[in-house]
Amino acid sequence: WHMNNEAGPSMALKVPEYPTTFSMQALHYSKEIEGGVIVVGPNGKRFCNEKYKTRHGKVPAHGTWKALTTPCPMHLIFDQSHMSAGPIYDGHPSHGWTQIVVQYDWSEDNNAELEKGWITKGDTIPDLAIKIGLDPSALDSTIARWNADAASGEDTEFGRTLMLMPLSSKGPY
């Protein structure tokens, strides 16, 4: 037994209707799903390698392990290609309270969750930013940088190597 450690946070969807979170397919370190996807904090900027496999929510930092940076609220930003690729929820039943106990049946096309307000849709990046309370120019700048990195095949900010796909230049998002 040991009590000198705690599990760190993870990036997941929390909705008012359920006490626990929903894991997102795009954030799973081993999944490759069509479409452009990034996670931003309340300043509209990326803050980590979204696909990094954490160890109980911890990441290596200068010879030690620290909790993954998780500014709140966080927003999973994705394009229509990702929305259409199948359920964004990782419903694999082998882990997590929501998967095992709640057994929520996420829709195959994500539209039921869009209708519930769990997913916010914007026709343009600035439109989406306004709807989710972000600075439109900050989010637009972040996506422009991500798209340039994805097109070059190198994430110059955080070294992400999986799902290096730009977000579409056409909405919706």
Q: Which stretches of residues belong to each language-model region?
A:
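Residues forming the flavin
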Residues: 1-144, 148-173
